């Protein structure tokens, strides 16, 4: 049988090859931080949102068997002395306007608790007026895509708007991530000591987006990236406490006295 040799493919003349300009490959540490700045234009945060919070005592199993007076009495340091977790109560969060809850908003037309409530903050927890963390239960919806609603009173700041103003300014700064904020007029109805109570005006709060894995993803960042809550603002090295998890002497409790791990545990 005859064998026919394959014809060689025609070569491309050098003059027909185009050279394109490519961006140089960047080292990972040289890539600028970018967040989704469009996120800040989804909702109008220039006004004031009205929230109605009905608090009631729950049960021991969920740790909500407390009164509203207890929630507002103890500071973080009191809980540390007692060696217990922060007290919580049941909460029914409803969002609306100055007339009441509004159709389409979280909690509308609901009568059973959809959240838990506890104080938030560290030194601010010693103030007479507390900051609150409202955690919407799973399956009970979200508010602006958030299940955790952090309300800050800013008692130490006479004007009460500097915190929000700072976050608003951060929105326009490249390579700096911010958090969504909203002024909130809060009304609270306390049913922990009986029924029939009316809503009490708690005044103006600043709602600040909870920085967690959900927020990282929402802002276009790595959901599994490094994220820490700073518990000590002295910013010393603390070699004896701040160690890698691979270090035989690593102690999570000592590490989190300074930095509480909220994301990846890879501390490199």
Where do the model's predicted regions map?
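Phosphate/dinucleotide-binding and metal-coordinating scaffold of catalytic cores
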Residues: 1-268
């Amino acid at each position: 049988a005859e064998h026919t040799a394959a014809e060689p493919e025609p070569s491309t003349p050098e003059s027909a090859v185009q050279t394109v300009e490519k961006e140089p490959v960047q080292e990972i540490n040289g890539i600028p931080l970018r967040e989704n700045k469009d996120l800040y234009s989804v909702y109008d945060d220039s006004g004031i949102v009205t929230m109605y919070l009905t608090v009631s005592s729950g049960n021991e199993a969920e740790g909500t068997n407390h009164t509203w007076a207890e929630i507002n009495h103890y500071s973080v340091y009191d809980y540390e002395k007692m060696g217990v977790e922060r007290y919580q109560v049941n909460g029914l969060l409803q969002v609306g306007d100055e007339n009441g809850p509004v159709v389409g908003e979280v909690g509308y037309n609901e009568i059973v608790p959809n959240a838990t409530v506890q104080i938030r903050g560290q030194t601010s927890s010693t103030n007479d007026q507390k900051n609150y963390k409202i955690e919407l239960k799973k399956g009970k919806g979200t508010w602006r895509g958030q299940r955790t609603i952090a309300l800050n009173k800013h008692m130490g700041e006479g004007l009460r708007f500097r915190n929000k103003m700072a976050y608003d300014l951060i929105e326009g700064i490249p390579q700096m991530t911010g958090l969504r904020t909203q002024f909130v007029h809060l009304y609270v109805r306390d049913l922990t000591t009986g029924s029939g109570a009316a809503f009490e005006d708690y005044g103006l709060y600043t709602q600040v987006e909870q920085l967690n894995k959900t927020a990282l993803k929402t802002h276009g960042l790595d959901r599994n990236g490094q994220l820490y809550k700073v518990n000590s603002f002295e910013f010393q090295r603390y070699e004896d406490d701040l160690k890698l998890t691979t270090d035989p002497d690593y102690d999570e409790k000592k590490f989190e006295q300074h930095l509480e791990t909220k994301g990846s545990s890879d501390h490199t």
